[in-house]
From Swiss-Prot:
It is an enzyme of class 2 (transferase). Pathway: Glycan metabolism; osmoregulated periplasmic glucan (OPG) biosynthesis. Keywords: Acyltransferase, Cell membrane, Membrane, Transferase, Transmembrane, Transmembrane helix. This is Glucans biosynthesis protein C. Its main location: membrane. The chain crosses the membrane at residues 17-37, 60-80, 91-111, 137-157, 173-193, 212-232, 239-259, 274-294, 311-331, 338-358. It is a multi-pass membrane protein. Belongs to the acyltransferase 3 family. OpgC subfamily. Pfam families: Acyl_transf_3 (PF01757). The keyword Acyltransferase applies. One of its GO terms (molecular function) is acyltransferase activity, transferring groups other than amino-acyl groups. Its EC number is 2.1.-.-.
Amino acid sequence: MNPVPAQREYFLDSIRAWLMLLGIPFHISLIYSSHTWHVNSAEPSLWLTLFNDFIHSFRMQVFFVISGYFSYMLFLRYPLKKWWKVRVERVGIPMLTAIPLLTLPQFIMLQYVKGKAESWPRLSLYDKYNTLAWELISHLWFLLVLVVMTTLCVWIFKRIRNNLENSDKTNKKFSMVKLSVIFLCLGIGYAVIRRTIFIVYPPILSNGMFNFIVMQTLFYLPFFILGALAFIFPHLKALFTTPSRGCTLAAALAFVAYLLNQRYGSGDAWMYETESVITMVLGLWMVNVVFSFGHRLLNFQSARVTYFVNASLFIYLVHHPLTLFFGAYITPHITSNWLGFLCGLIFVVGIAIILYEIHLRIPLLKFLFSGKPVVKRENDKAPAR
């Protein structure tokens, strides 16, 4: 075990929480966007579609960089087996808890909302399995990907640590140009792999478990490893926390390219491959934009911020079925898209916070939704004075 910095990275905690909570306006705006979802408003909103595309273009790339950063920090804190156990418990237990308590009821509700309940018995065994894979994993996909990444990084992090012991890490130099070229090549590599699969056996791309375990892991693993490297090399971390006009401009241009691909691309042609290349480099540049912004404005301790940092995972887990309920039963009664969007935010966030406060008072639920054992403090046992 190696010592780890004692100073808390408040801005990274805050960014991770905000990225998680951005899932709420992302999914609510999806109802009012031009993208087809489980539930949609009668008429799409151009501006809410643009807002939805903006969040979707970079959010998870930056999230996985932060996850990799904190994962490697814990890797240095614990023995290898304990590290894997702690990491898998913290993401795996909430995921397994949310499936029967959240995504299964959500799936049943959608079966009736979309009028598919009657056709369910006629589906083949594989179609039932694949539908359940997509619908029960649902918005929990990133937790499954984190479990897979953690398992892979048992070997990857060991290799990184061993290489560091045999080299001088102070001489390692990074530049955004080099990183951009690397991530461009990674994006092209991912696109080639996806295209090859599409040519050889296209049905596998519609398999839910293959998509989550293989394709999503393959795309986001470079960002996870980049986060670990940012923890190891202060120069790399400083590269991300220092504002860069070049990164901001490049990210803006990449987002325009992303929108053009969404508008004019075709799923039967090269739209998905082009998107993977664009979002790979866009994600890298947005790491600089988000980190530098967060380092300047969010690097402080606050009771209110700490509350939402602690609550962000639970709120994210419960927001999805609440959003779909709102979209199915309340959205049709609100004629204004923007009013519906704001009402959706109030509805979902308000109920999610109430549920969070309730679950804090039930030790079993608190454990199941956090993956952390409830530790009773000695102060709690002291008699009142």
